[in-house]
Structures are given as structure tokens and as C-alpha cells.
């Protein structure tokens, strides 16, 4: 059953007349009064109380420009790691020592990239492809390219859990004694620092003004061979 992807009804059994057979038995709010009676704290405009498509914008509602970048950057998870806390588990890093920059083969061919070639990830608000740690150290945002048919053309993906600058990934001096870094903990790439900044706030990424969460899937980037 698992090999088939699940257990399924015949298509015709899913319907009773013009309605679905398995109905959702609870209340579904298509209009949310709490949202509709709340103002956007940045613009003063009323929020929508109903489902609507809202184009990507900064905190003032202004459209986002991507400076010619065309590849859509997204993130994903790997079954081997949590978001960040398991890079110290060497049983797991032995299975997959680093993550990769995943792109579709058609994009790789168009950009002149090949499997295992390293590439920089640049964006409109991080054209230098570097992560400024604020202590005089800047880390390059560069990783190994891997093509995959399972990713949509025009999309760039990296899995979370790699590309650390802490957790022992860099040298640390404690009470005058050097604690040397472990290169295994720094392996791979973490491209969060490439993600688009809010043009008005400037020191934070784009955010969902209704829910308050960070926007991880609306940055467009450029890949440059390293």
C-alpha cells in the first residue's frame, strides 16, 4: 500500500451528486471579523477579512524589486537534521556531510553550471553573497550545485541545518584559551542572509504583516559560478 502512495477511493465514489461525499463537518470561516477590524500598523489601512491574493511587498505595501534576479529561492528540511541543532551529530553528518544548492537541469544548462560545481548566491539586498557576522568576520554564501529533476525550473532550494558559524564551526577564545573549530560543523551553505530585506526597515527580512512571520519563499536570486 505504501509503495502505491496510499489507499484510494475510485474517483466516482468521491461524489454524491454535485457535492463531495466526505464533507468537512466543522465551521470554516471564510470571513474573519477580527482581521477585518484590524488596521495594518505600518500603513493604517484595514486588513482584509477574507481570502485574497496579496503580491509580495515591503512593510509599507510597496512592490518588491529584485534587481534582475530571476531564480526563486526556497528552503526545505532534510529528514536527517533539525533546523540547526544536530550538526554536532557525526553519525548524521557521516551520511550527508553537507547540503547543496538544488536547481533544475534546464536552469543549470542555461547558467553554465554543472553538478558539484560551486556557485555564489546573490540577491538585490546581498549582492556580495556574504554573511556579515558583525564581529569583523564575513562568511561567503557559496555552495555546491546539484541538479534535480524533482525541483521546478526557476527555483533554487537549500535544505536547512548546514552552513553554521557557531556550534563550534568557528574558532572561539574562552578565558584566553583557543577552542579550535571543527570544519564538519561549518560544511554546506546557509542562504538566509541572502533573503530579501524590507526596503523600508532595512535591518530585517520581509514579513507577513497579518501573521507576523518571516517570508522565506519570496526572494529572487542569481547564481554565479565560483
What does each model-identified segment do?
Residues 1-89:
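Long, low-complexity segments enriched in small/aliphatic residues
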Residues 1-4, 13, 17-24, 30, ...:
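Long, contiguous, secondary-structure-rich segments that constitute the structural scaffold
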Amino acid at each position: 500500500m505504501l509503495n502505491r502512495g496510499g489507499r484510494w477511493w475510485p474517483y466516482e465514489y468521491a461524489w454524491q451528486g454535485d457535492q463531495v461525499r466526505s464533507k468537512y463537518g466543522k465551521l470554516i470561516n471564510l470571513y474573519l471579523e477580527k482581521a477585518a477590524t484590524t488596521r495594518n500598523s505600518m500603513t493604517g489601512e484595514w486588513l482584509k477579512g477574507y481570502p485574497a491574493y496579496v503580491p509580495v511587498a515591503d512593510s509599507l505595501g510597496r512592490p518588491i524589486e529584485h534587481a534582475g534576479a530571476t531564480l526563486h529561492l526556497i528552503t526545505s528540511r532534510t529528514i536527517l537534521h533539525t533546523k540547526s541543532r544536530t550538526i554536532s551529530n557525526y553519525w548524521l553528518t557521516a551520511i550527508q556531510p553537507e547540503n547543496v544548492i538544488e536547481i533544475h537541469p534546464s536552469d543549470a544548462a542555461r547558467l553554465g553550471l554543472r553538478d558539484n560545481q560551486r556557485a555564489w548566491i546573490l540577491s538585490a539586498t546581498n549582492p556580495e553573497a556574504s554573511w556579515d557576522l558583525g564581529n569583523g568576520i564575513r562568511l561567503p554564501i557559496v555552495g555546491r550545485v546539484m541538479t534535480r529533476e524533482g525541483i521546478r525550473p526557476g527555483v533554487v532550494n537549500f535544505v536547512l541545518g548546514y552552513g553554521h558559524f557557531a556550534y563550534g564551526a568557528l574558532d572561539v577564545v574562552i578565558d584566553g584559551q583557543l577552542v579550535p573549530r571543527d570544519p564538519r560543523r561549518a560544511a554546506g551553505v546557509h542562504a538566509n542572509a541572502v533573503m530579501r530585506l524590507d526596503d523600508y526597515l532595512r535591518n530585517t527580512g520581509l514579513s507577513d504583516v497579518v501573521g507576523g512571520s518571516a517570508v522565506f519563499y519570496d526572494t529572487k536570486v542569481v547564481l554565479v559560478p565560483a
